[in-house]
Amino acid sequence: MAAQDKYKFVFTAKEAASEGVTEPIRLPKLIRKAMSLARGPISKYKVGAVGRASSGRVYLGVNVEFPGLPLHHSIHPEQFLVTNLALNSEKGLRQLAVAISSDCIEFGAPCGNCRQFLMETSNELDIKILLKSKHEAEGSFSSLKLLLPYRFTPDDVLPKGSPLLLEKRDNCLTLSGSTEEICSSDCSHLKCKALAAANNSFSPYTESPSGVALQDDEGKWYRGWYIESVAYSPSLGPVQAALVDFVARSRGKGFNKIVEAVLVEKNNARVSQERTAKMILDTIAAPNCDFKVFHCYVDLQKKFITE
């Protein structure tokens, strides 16, 4: 592959085929590339995942660690991959391969945290996971439902028909009653992007949607939104989701190139991201990173119309 594509995280079906991924069982052909993009400065361990979306496009997932922060703020490769699916408006994940050995020979089941995270997707029971020992030439696929028996799922909590992760949603949030006010002359524009992210946020369990927008030193912006898990602890915060976008599209930039950040979260939310977001950005972003927080409200008229 050309040198200019060494930071590529998303492949069309044709591009994937040119890399040897001509069928799902060949997903491991891209695993070394995924591992080369991982950011594991604490563990010194690079973990990669490769997944095929329902569109046929192939995505890479990597582990991301943050020196100076507690380990639970790290991003798992499977979380990275699914978040990037959401950011690219994919409708589902079909097959997934996760390397469990540094030599890229063995592939195994996602950790329990990520199996639970995968349960939030709209086609969770159809997801196939590649299992391959070092003694097998190709391995075989197993379903997520077999790898997570006696599972606790969104169906146990949410009303029937509720939109799940990777399904279209609009949280009907607004910063004020006026679009003109949102985009007035003092608007940083990141505020609008963070609001749009919050409107995509998957937070059906606490109803605390939030979104983050980041800007780097060259003016390029990135965004992500809070993704909840029915099991709570596997949830992914909005800063981490925005950092998935940053890692996937910044072409190798360090987090210290992030110079501006905006968090939009629901007013009086049961789960607030403000303090955690500030802690993360204070630790990894540029020393002078400008961090702003805006509180949004549900537009009841819009919500009534959409329902």
Swiss-Prot record:
Recorded catalytic reaction(s): these are: cytidine + H2O + H(+) = uridine + NH4(+); 2'-deoxycytidine + H2O + H(+) = 2'-deoxyuridine + NH4(+)
Q: Where are the transmembrane segments?
A: none
Q: Where is the active site?
A: 78 (proton donor)
Name the Gene3D superfamilies on file. Cytidine Deaminase, domain 2
Q: How is the cofactor bound?
A: Binds 1 zinc ion per subunit.
Its required cofactor(s), as named, are: Zn(2+)
Mind telling me which PANTHER family this protein's record contains?
Answer: CYTIDINE DEAMINASE
**Function according to Swiss-Prot or TrEMBL:** This enzyme scavenges exogenous and endogenous cytidine and 2'-deoxycytidine for UMP synthesis.
What's the name of the protein?
Answer: Cytidine deaminase 7
Which gene is the coding source of this polypeptide chain? CDA7
